[in-house]
Regions:
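C-terminal substrate-binding subdomain of Rossmann-fold SDR/epimerase-dehydratase oxidoreductases
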Residues: 201-285
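A conserved pocket-lining segment of Rossmann-fold NAD(P)-dependent short-chain dehydrogenase/reductase
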Residues: 131-138, 165-198
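Glycine/proline-rich active-site loop of Rossmann-fold NAD(P)-dependent oxidoreductases
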Residues: 158-162, 173-185, 209-220
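NAD(P)-cofactor binding segment of oxidoreductase domains
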Residues: 64, 76-105
Length: 285
């Protein structure tokens, strides 16, 4: 039975990742600052900023999925966010390399593109935003994610470890769909995330597929649903909120996501299964 350590497994996404790996027959260890609300697997309380503790919790693992982080900008002092997110990721990858672990998945973010937490509202250079889009954050959170992706590149160069960095869209647990009717008809809401989202169950499956994939090297992948989180068609969203953007790389038919997931689908053989439209009744009104 392969063993995977999930850091941040007690969190909103982490608990779904833990659940998915357990259901697929993996031995799972949750490494976090608190225990899981339901005992899906063994939990180890760990400070990821302490390299020795990280070595201890990763010992014997075949793979690590690193989700633990300060998850947004401006919730903590900027330097605290940067230090925590960068050092914890460095320690996880450094310890994994030292222990001979060959597979890692780390949580990056769509925030690295620079739109989400910009001081003044800015639009994308083109849509759908793919992994080649410039990353121009103005905040320590987005910058920390770029540094983490570069740490992944370095570890791969040095050791050959496969490290997949997920630039996650807005992560949505199933119980959050009840809030969607409050915003799906208002283009002004959620514009900074380009109206993207990803169901926790689809993100969890992507984590497993990345662990099971071979030959990816160090690669960053957008993880988003196929559709936007809005009832308004995607072209209308862009015309209403970002009329200055004229570079459309696809036809933007219907409600196509403005955060491209094509690379992840191709490399991981992954297909998002969960859409908010299947959970929310009467959204067309």
């Amino acid at each position: 039975m392969p063993k995977v350590v999930v850091t941040g497994g007690s969190g909103m996404l982490g608990r779904w990742v833990v659940k998915h790996f357990v259901e697929k027959g993996y031995e799972v260890v949750n490494a976090d600052v608190k225990h899981l609300a339901e005992p899906l697997c063994r939990s180890v309380i760990v400070d990821l900023n302490q390299l020795g503790e990280v070595y201890g919790v990763l010992a014997g693992a075949d793979a690590v999925v690193h989700l633990a982080a300060i998850p947004v900008a401006y919730s903590h002092p900027n330097e605290v966010t940067f230090q925590n997110n960068v050092m914890s990721t460095y320690n996880v990858l450094e310890a994994a390399a030292g222990l001979g672990i060959r597979k890692a998945v780390i949580a990056s973010s769509e925030s690295s593109y620079g739109l989400v937490f910009a001081r003044e509202r800015i639009g994308p250079q083109y849509v759908p935003v793919d992994e080649a889009h410039p990353q121009v954050p103005q905040d320590s959170y987005g910058l920390s994610k770029i540094v983490n992706e570069q740490t992944a590149d370095m570890i791969h160069r040095r050791t050959g470890m496969q490290v997949v960095s997920f630039r996650l869209g807005n992560v949505i647990a199933p119980d959050a769909y009840e809030r969607f009717p409050s915003f799906v008809h208002d283009p002004e809401q959620r514009e900074r995330i380009l109206w993207s989202y990803i169901d926790t169950r689809d993100a969890a499956e992507a984590c497993r597929l990345a662990v099971e994939a071979e030959g990816l090297g160090s690669v960053a992948l957008n993880i988003a649903a196929d559709d936007s989180s809005m009832a308004v068609p995607s072209r209308e969203l862009m015309a209403a909120r970002f009329p200055e953007v004229r570079d459309f790389r696809t036809a933007l038919a219907g409600h196509e996501s403005l955060l491209s997931n094509e690379k992840a689908k191709r490399l991981l053989n992954w297909q998002p299964k969960y859409a908010w439209r299947d959970h929310v009744k009467g959204w067309e009104k």
